[in-house]
Amino acid sequence: MKKNFQRTLLDLANGICLLDCYLTLGGYETFEDKMFYVLKAQSKHLVGDDGYVNDANRLFTEVLGKNKKVYKTYEYHGDEPVIACWEGKHFTIVQNGKVIYDPLGERENPYKEITSYRVVEDK
């Protein structure tokens, strides 16, 4: 099941990258609007109609608007969280301090860029 979850994350990352150009032309006013639209469109198999994550997967979100960065943190059954960093057109996924998805090959360790972020838990 863990491999399936990681595969889902990679599919989500690919979907975000592929949809970026389309959404840029779609008239969305802000970066945050565009990001949340993509995440909603690409994660229907993870998130139920009520907005909560299914299958015991907890989804946390932090948006750092001033830096135009969005960090998504997925906690999977007590394992080390997977941190997905979106910066403009660059998307990176890190787990256990190792990059597991980096399409442009530009990040040695994205953890060092995340100096602080607040985790907001769905209730």
What spans do the regions from the language model cover?
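Short intrinsically disordered terminal tails
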Residues: M1, E121-K123
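Conserved active-site-adjacent core of cysteine acyl-enzyme catalytic domains
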Residues: Y28, V38-G105, P110-T115, E121
